[in-house]
Structure formats: C-alpha cells, structure tokens
Amino acid sequence: MKTSIVERPAQHWVGYRLQGPWQETVPQGFAQLKDWVARHALQGEWMAIYYGNPQVVPPQELSVETVLTVPADFALAVGEGIQHGTLAGGHYFHTCTEVQNNDFFSAWNAFFAQLQQRSDWQVDDRPCYEHYLSDGSQSGNWLLNMYIPVRPV
C-alpha cells in the first residue's frame, strides 16, 4: 500500500448526515444524495466523512456525512432537507486503494496499520474520509482515496 502525507484544501459540500451503523447509513445516505443530485443536475466529488472510532464507539452512535463537493459560493435552497458544510483542510495521511467485495473495514485497518508504523505523525481530531473514484455499488469493487487527518508529533 503506497501512502503519503498530503496537504488538502478545505472542501465545501452538500449532503446528508446520518447516525447509526455505517454499513446501513452510508448506502442510505448515498441513495438519498444520488436522488437529490439527479434533481439538481450537479457535479462534484462524492465523499463519505466519518465521525467516531468503530473500535470504541457503539455502532448506533457512529455518524457519517455522505456528500458531494460544491463551489464555495454554492447557494442551497431553503427547505430542501439537505445540509451544506465544509470539510476542514490540512495535513492528511493518504492512500489510493481498491476495495474488493465492499470490505471497507479491512482496507481501513490496513491503512491505519501503515500510519501506526510512522513516528512523525499522529491522528488528530478531524474526521477521516473517503473520496470515491468509481461507483462499486453494483459490483462491490471500489477505487477510492482514503484520508486520515494527521498532525506532526
């Protein structure tokens, strides 16, 4: 797995925040977002922003934002039921990987193991996120960028 530290800009987004087990909320959030995006003919980067550590937080307390990036000046119509937010920029530990058979758990575990081998960077309190480069919703196979927020030790 090739990894690197990258500097990412802040990214503005529209999307849905859901709470509960990620294996349920992520597909649900993207289904909602896909319908909303189709009605508004928008284009952008598809991402999932994760809140909570699944090794210590009960599944029902985990949260995710399923989002599409938009320009900074994007104006969201009132009453649409969708949220507008900003993903913080800064340093991130990055990899581009292929997930097979929807096994995101193994991909994240391997990625975190790579970070733990480094002594010069540590995880900070911003959320981890995925940027999807392909749609694996039918095949279960995904190409994506994974990001862990970090700060120097």
Curated annotation (Swiss-Prot):
Quaternary structure, per UniProt, is:
Interacts with DNA gyrase.
Identify its protein family.
Answer: Belongs to the DNA gyrase inhibitor family.
Q: Which Gene3D superfamilies match?
A: Regulatory factor, effector binding domain
Please provide, in alphabetical order, the Gene Ontology terms of the cellular component aspect for this entry.
Answer: cytoplasm
- Record keywords: Cytoplasm, Stress response
Q: What is this protein called?
A: DNA gyrase inhibitor
Q: Which InterPro entries match?
A: AraC_E-bd, DNA_gyrase_inhibitor, DNA_gyrase_inhibitor_GyrI, GyrI-like, Reg_factor_effector_dom_sf
- Cell cycle: present as a keyword of the record? no
Task: Provide the taxonomic classification.
Answer: Bacteria, Pseudomonadati, Pseudomonadota, Gammaproteobacteria, Enterobacterales
Q: Which Pfam families match?
A: GyrI-like
Q: What is its main location?
A: cytoplasm
Q: List the disulfide bonds.
A: none
Stored HAMAP family:
DNA_gyrase_inhibitor
What the protein does comes down to: Inhibits the supercoiling activity of DNA gyrase. Acts by inhibiting DNA gyrase at an early step, prior to (or at the step of) binding of DNA by the gyrase. It protects cells against toxins that target DNA gyrase, by inhibiting activity of these toxins and reducing the formation of lethal double-strand breaks in the cell.
Q: Which GO terms describe its molecular function?
A: DNA topoisomerase type II (double strand cut, ATP-hydrolyzing) inhibitor activity
Keyword Secreted set for record = no
Q: Where in the cell is it found?
A: Cytoplasm
